[in-house]
């Protein structure tokens, strides 16, 4: 803790120079201050107003209906991560101004109630409100962005952005969404909003020439990297062990267990086995159960506040929230969303895509993941370095929060050579979301400070 505070003091001295020899620089924005701050705001004030993440944790991600959380209710999943972010920072829960939870499948009023229950399970008092947000697969990231925006607006000082999904408890409709407005059939774009996600994956593969081999290779790499991350033990930094139970489906006997490892990863995944799988959504297509994300159970939570408050409390800073963007794309190829959202988010942060050191891009389907990476000409050694949703799983509402925890802990491990990171995902009905983060301790002696090449205007 003392070392973290000393690092912050070092940066403060750089941002608030007293030597007259530096007077010519006093009107220039700090390299680490928000790129769009107005001229009246001093670098010192802008620095203190940064929205920072002081804790980000997740549960393990488990196979729906077959994995370690198959008999764990969503409010119990959420409670575990809500409790972790306050206990591990020694924060008084009553100081939290709001808890925003991303969640997708469950009926809205039911899940809102469950999230309030989870807050009580985690020890939060009556005074702390809770709400849910649903922007499909970006819901967890949207929750974090909503909290960051509310803190910046002055609505409250401390907030938690979280996500939860129990796809064991709540199921995606197998036959599509019922009760849609019949008028949608008269509007092609509206009709395309109702397409099964797997068909949109096939559309991306066909329109942009993503081959079955490319998709299977991406799947193998995802499992390989996830297995290596688990074997190394590095994911213990971000995963909260959850004490729960599993129920034998035949005898109904209950067994107490502790879940702390992602259980959908297949270390022996290989091209030969994947090539044997039949396509799922279209005859002679290319999307299979092996190169698409898994349905999963899990939760994540992210604790945010202003940098000035974090420093006052002596909390080490894990990351800085720099920008967030959501963009619309054609519903029939919704998976291309990251290819549009990532440049939008980096531009808002005053950066170019080439300035980003690490990416977490949700692998909803290998087709759209491969396309997005190729379109942006990304260095694949910087993308999903610990595996992605094909291997780990995709609990819809929790994925955004899971990615924040994974990205920021990996950036911390990499140190001074990893300053900026991006999280992105596609969104059903045709959207993409992306956020830019800066490593929290990137101010160590300003050893890695560099001028961003992007246009900040």
UniProtKB/Swiss-Prot annotation:
Pfam families: Thiolase_C, Thiolase_N. Keywords: Acyltransferase, Fatty acid biosynthesis, Fatty acid metabolism, Lipid biosynthesis, Lipid metabolism, Oxylipin biosynthesis, Peroxisome, Transferase, Transit peptide. One of its GO terms (molecular function) is acetyl-CoA C-acyltransferase activity. The gene is KAT5. Probably involved in long chain fatty-acid beta-oxidation prior to gluconeogenesis during germination and subsequent seedling growth. Involved in systemic jasmonic acid (JA) biosynthesis after wounding and may be during senescence. Induction: Induced by jasmonic acid (JA) and systemically by wounding. Slightly induced by dehydration. It comes from Arabidopsis thaliana. Homodimer. This is 3-ketoacyl-CoA thiolase 5, peroxisomal. Residues 1-37 form a transit peptide. Its main location: other.
């Amino acid at each position: 803790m003392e070392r973290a505070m000393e690092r912050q003091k070092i940066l403060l001295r750089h941002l608030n120079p007293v030597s007259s020899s530096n007077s010519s620089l006093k009107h220039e924005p700090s390299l680490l201050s928000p790129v769009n701050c107005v001229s009246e705001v001093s670098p010192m004030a802008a620095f203190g107003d940064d929205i920072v993440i002081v804790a980000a944790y997740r549960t393990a991600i488990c196979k729906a209906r077959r994995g370690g959380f198959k008999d764990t209710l969503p409010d119990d999943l959420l409670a575990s991560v809500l409790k972790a972010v306050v206990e591990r920072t020694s924060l008084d829960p009553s100081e939290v101004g709001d808890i925003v939870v991303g969640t997708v499948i469950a009926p809205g009023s039911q899940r809102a109630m469950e999230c309030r229950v989870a807050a009580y399970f985690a020890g939060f008092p009556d005074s702390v409100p809770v709400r849910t947000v649903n922007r499909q697969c970006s819901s967890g990231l949207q929750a974090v962005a909503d909290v960051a925006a509310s803190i910046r607006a002055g609505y409250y000082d401390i907030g938690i952005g979280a996500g939860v999904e129990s796809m064991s408890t709540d199921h995606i409709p197998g036959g599509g969404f019922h009760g849609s407005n019949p008028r949608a059939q008269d509007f092609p774009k509206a009709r395309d909003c109702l397409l099964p996600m797997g068909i949109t994956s096939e559309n991306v593969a066909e329109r942009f020439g993503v081959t079955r081999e490319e998709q299977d290779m991406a799947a193998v790499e995802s499992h390989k990297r996830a297995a290596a991350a688990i074997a190394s033990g590095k994911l213990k930094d971000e995963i909260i062990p959850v004490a729960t139970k599993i129920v034998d489906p035949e005898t109904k006997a209950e067994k107490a267990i502790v879940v702390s490892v992602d259980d959908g990863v297949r270390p022996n995944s290989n091209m030969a086995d994947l090539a044997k799988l039949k396509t799922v959504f279209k005859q002679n297509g290319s999307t299979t159960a092996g190169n698409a994300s898994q349905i999963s159970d899990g939760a994540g939570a992210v604790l945010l506040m202003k940098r000035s408050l974090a420093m006052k409390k002596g909390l080490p800073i894990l990351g800085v929230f720099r920008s967030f963007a959501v963009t619309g794309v054609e519903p029939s190829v919704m998976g291309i969303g990251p290819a549009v959202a990532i440049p939008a988010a980096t531009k808002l942060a005053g950066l170019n895509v080439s300035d980003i050191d690490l990416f977490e891009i949700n692998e909803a389907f290998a087709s759209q993941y491969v396309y997005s990476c190729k379109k942006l000409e990304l260095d694949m050694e910087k993308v999903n370095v610990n595996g992605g949703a094909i291997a780990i799983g995709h609990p819809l509402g929790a994925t955004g929060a899971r990615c924040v925890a994974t990205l920021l802990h990996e950036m911390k491990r990499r140190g001074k050579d990893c300053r900026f990171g991006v999280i992105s995902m596609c969104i059903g009905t045709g959207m993409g979301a992306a956020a830019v983060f800066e490593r929290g301790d990137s101010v160590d002696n300003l050893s890695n400070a560099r001028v961003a090449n992007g246009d900040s205007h």
